[in-house]
């Protein structure tokens, strides 16, 4: 439903759709945004936030992080050079990348792998931040693990996120951090 609204109703976007999760977006200084949304009146066991200075895209409130879908929030820093390949793959499965930001496509990739395919988050990390082939072939993984990682690299090659990045995923009862393979 969220993707349909964001795709079909011109100028309308659903930015927060999770149970027991709120997303607040704005362009401005953090202290002004906090006052505007009266964040001091909320309680939570975890928060994700992002201060963004856009370098490649225009700054607008819809592009502000975190990006959310159902019970996931994603914030990221970096430059995702695989955006077009990632977007083309994920759009084959009904997702629409209307906001044209790499964080949006990361959120949809995580949703697709974890929620729709039932892949555990540890394996999601192995897909989107997969080891280099040379690392896979180095013998540092068990035979079973090597086979699993090879399978992910072959089947989900279009979901490998490339470029320098760090990602924080917030979800019900947890946080997960990922970074590119060169760090």
Model-flagged regions — what are they?
Residues 1-182:
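Conserved short alpha-helical segments that host acidic/polar catalytic motifs at enzyme active sites
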